[in-house]
Amino acid sequence: DLGMEGEPESVKAYYEGAATMGEIAKKAAAMEGADFVALILEGGDPNGVNKSVDELIAVVKEVADAIDAPLVVEGCKNVEKDAELLPKVAEALQGRNVLILSEKEENYKAIGAAAGLAYDQIVGAESAVDINLAKQLNVVTTQLGVNAQKIVMNIGSAAAGYGYEYVVSTMDRIKGAALSQNDNMLQMPIITPVSSETWGVKEATASEADMPEWGPEEERGIDMEVMTAAADLAAGSDAVILRHPEAVAAISRMIKALA
């Protein structure tokens, strides 16, 4: 919801001419290889821009009205604000069948009940790279009355090389339990936010002046995004959230080649 502020230059170039959030969303939906659009309501963070819920809902409606593609709406990552915001998002988009990211242990009653029950959206259940926490959140969400088929897991993420082995091992255990043990509380699809992790690490942010041997800064960011997304998909993730058009196209080509 913050537009192109702070984005890499080639990302800005792709969205050139898009002056509103609706226009940006249309360009995102038209990106080569894109299967869905993710709207991140970062501006709602009370420790950041701190947009009001009403302001954010207006953005959500504008984006939803602009595209026909499947829509993921992610909160601001502040537990209290998301507990207020995401139920309103679910209400505003009733009938659209959007994925609401994410409920957590601290706010699952507010978000899960609104998104999964009152407004029949898809509930994103976010845990912190732990199979037991992931399963427990799925269990308590279904105990609210949410259909298990309306739950998608976000089991946590990391950039490749940054404790990433914990993500892989957790996905491996989840998929193993879901398949070999027929654990129906771990059989939900997994979505992994990749770009929020990869574009913040030093390999993507260090300038060419500081690290000339690493090559062009933006290419490194794309490489980190592609490598991490490919590893997530190989480990068991069913969908990944990406930022750079080249990364989206590369991962789409990889999926098609392996299909």
Predicted segments, located by residue:
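Catalytic alpha/beta core domains of metabolic enzymes, predominantly
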Residues: 106-247, 251-254
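Glycine-rich, proline-tolerant flexible connector loops at the mouths of alpha/beta enzymes
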Residues: 5-9, 33-62, 67, 73-80, ...
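Short loop/turn segments at strand-loop or loop-helix junctions that form parts
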Residues: 1-2, 37-44, 155-156, 193-196
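Active-site mouth loops of central-metabolism enzymes
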Residues: 1-27, 48-51, 75-79, 101-103, ...
